[in-house]
Amino acid sequence: MKGYLSYLILWILRKKRLNGAQIGRELEKRRGTKPSPGTIYPALKELKNNDLINVDNNKFYSLTNNGERELISACKFFCQIFYDMEKMSDFCKNSDNEKN
């Protein structure tokens, strides 16, 4: 799976089923701009093809068990990146203090 949008959709679907329009509104809240249907629906299709989400007859999307595992894995990965960034920031601050 690629792209920030796909992970954000999984994050949005972690608590409840939503249709495409509702997902678009949730994305708008988080990103400040609403992606077009031409952006949202291909991402949803890719997620479904990768067995990360389900879609029912009423066009409501939900996470699969695989989607939940992928989201957990992504969260751990992103947390590690931010942890490493914090450590690098501390290192840079300390090295600046040593120069003075």
Regions found by a protein language model. Name each.
Residues 13, 39, 53-55:
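Alpha-helix C-terminal capping segments
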Residues 26, 43, 88:
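Short acidic/histidine-centered micro-motifs embedded in hydrophobic/aromatic stretches
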Residues 40-42, 46-47:
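Basic amphipathic alpha-helical segments that dock to polyanions
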